[in-house]
């Protein structure tokens, strides 16, 4: 998955799903222009609405997301997460398919860095609603907008990621696949590392 920004090798934020951004003079409002070539692994375009939906879902108290607090910088986010305001009052709106406006509670100099954190990643609303409570529980119940897609997930054993052929920056992705193993015994982990 990929957010509006990612961190480069020097840990500096660089545009990812966003093509560019502007910040208001008071530092409390950001406008992001999204890449028109950013796609989900199912071929759907990644839109500003995907970010709004994901952030509203993150903050919905019924979701009980452990990392919801990381979005409290966004206007009304904390009140929404506490059930004091509806998710529709979140300070994030899709101006059009490729323009996202975000209002903050106060200036946050490291806000672009935060956007690289997974809690700020988008979700394909249509796909999430289609999968319902099964969303994200298996490799085939998730769509991806980043450099890799999960092609196999054997619970308690491991998972496999394959290069996402729909990824906007696929030319720079050098690996074709990544295999992860779940290893519970510390001694086994050490032996595998050597």
Predicted stretch roles:
Residues 179-191:
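Short helix-initiation/N-cap motifs at beta->coil->alpha
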Residues 1-25, 143-144:
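N-terminal lobe/hinge region of extracytoplasmic solute-binding protein
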Residues 23, 33-34, 94, 104, ...:
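Hydrophobic residues in beta-strands and at strand termini
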Residues 33, 52, 66-126:
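Surface-exposed binding/hinge segments that line
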Residues 104-177, 187:
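Gly/Pro-rich hinge or "lid" segments in bacterial periplasmic/extracellular proteins
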Residues 25, 94-96, 155:
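Residue-level recognition of beta-strand termini and adjacent short loop/turns
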Residues 19-67, 101, 189, 194:
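Aromatic- and charge-enriched surface segment that lines or borders ligand/interaction sites
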């Amino acid at each position: 998955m990929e957010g509006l920004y990612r961190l480069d090798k020097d840990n500096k934020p660089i545009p990812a799903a966003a093509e560019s951004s502007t910040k208001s003079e008071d530092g409390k409002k950001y406008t992001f222009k999204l890449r028109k070539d950013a796609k989900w692994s199912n071929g759907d375009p990644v839109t500003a609405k995907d970010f709004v939906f994901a952030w509203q879902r993150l903050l919905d108290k019924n979701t009980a997301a452990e990392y919801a607090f990381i979005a409290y910088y966004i206007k009304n986010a904390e009140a929404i997460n506490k059930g004091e305001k509806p998710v529709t009052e979140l300070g994030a709106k899709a101006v059009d398919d490729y323009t996202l406006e975000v209002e903050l509670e106060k200036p946050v100099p490291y806000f672009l860095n935060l956007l690289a954190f997974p809690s700020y990643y988008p979700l394909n609303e249509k796909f999430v609603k289609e999968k319902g409570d099964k969303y994200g529980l298996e490799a085939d119940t998730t769509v991806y907008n980043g450099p890799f897609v999960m092609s196999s997930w054997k619970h308690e054993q491991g998972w496999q990621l394959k290069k996402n052929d729909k990824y906007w920056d696929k030319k720079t992705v050098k690996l074709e696949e990544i295999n992860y193993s779940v290893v519970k015994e510390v001694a086994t982990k050490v032996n595998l590392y050597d």
